[in-house]
């Protein structure tokens, strides 16, 4: 008996509108699509997920007290260089990074996970430069209800 190895010859592009969607629900859906877990022939060691374009990143919703309670921390590399900012400040400055941070935290941390990072495209507004790829619109609410 031979081992079945699925082919990865289709490059699907999906557009997700983040307006009014909670950050965690959006991130789980996007990470699952990028990884390819929605496919019936999912294989963990093969990159076969979709390219996901997220628009309206500035309109994503954080529930509860997370706008002021959630803190993003980074280290510059210098002494005393620990920089922190709240989710409210991060959404005001660069809303794309908030979604990227949430999605990348749900992807594998090794070589394959770093290769999956290029499959996520996040834009603050409604326009994106990927119209040539003919992306399909994906409704977050209906996609979450199917599971």
From Swiss-Prot:
Q: List, alphabetically, the InterPro entries matched.
A: Ribosomal_uL13, Ribosomal_uL13_bac-type, Ribosomal_uL13_CS, Ribosomal_uL13_sf
Q: How does it assemble?
A: Part of the 50S ribosomal subunit.
User: Does the record bear Nucleotidyltransferase in its keywords?
Assistant: no
Phylogenetic classification of the source organism: Bacteria, Thermotogati, Deinococcota, Deinococci, Deinococcales
What are the alphabetically sorted keywords of the record?
Ribonucleoprotein, Ribosomal protein
Q: Which family does it belong to?
A: Belongs to the universal ribosomal protein uL13 family.
Single GO cellular component annotation? cytosolic large ribosomal subunit
Q: What name appears for this protein in its UniProt entry?
A: Large ribosomal subunit protein uL13
What does the protein in this record do? This protein is one of the early assembly proteins of the 50S ribosomal subunit, although it is not seen to bind rRNA by itself. It is important during the early stages of 50S assembly.
UniProt-listed GO biological process terms = negative regulation of translation; translation
Q: Which GO terms describe its molecular function?
A: mRNA binding; structural constituent of ribosome
Pfam families the UniProt entry points to = Ribosomal_L13
Name the PANTHER family on file.
LARGE RIBOSOMAL SUBUNIT PROTEIN UL13M (PTHR11545:SF2), RIBOSOMAL PROTEIN L13 (PTHR11545)
Q: Which organism is it from?
A: Deinococcus geothermalis (strain DSM 11300 / CIP 105573 / AG-3a)
């Amino acid at each position: 008996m031979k081992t079945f190895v699925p082919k990865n010859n289709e490059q699907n592009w999906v557009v997700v509108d983040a307006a009014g969607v909670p950050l965690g629900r959006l991130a789980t859906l996007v990470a699952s699509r990028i990884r390819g877990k929605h496919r019936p022939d999912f294989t963990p060691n093969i990159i076969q997920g979709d390219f996901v374009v997220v628009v309206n990143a500035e309109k994503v919703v954080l529930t509860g007290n997370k706008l002021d309670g959630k803190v993003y921390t980074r280290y510059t590399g210098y002494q005393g260089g620990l920089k922190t900012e709240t989710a409210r400040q991060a959404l005001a400055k660069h809303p794309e990074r908030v979604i990227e941070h949430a999605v990348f935290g749900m992807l594998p941390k090794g070589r394959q996970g770093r290769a999956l990072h290029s499959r996520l495209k996040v834009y603050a507004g409604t326009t994106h430069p990927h119209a040539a790829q003919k992306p399909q619109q994906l409704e977050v609410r209906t996609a979450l209800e199917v599971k």
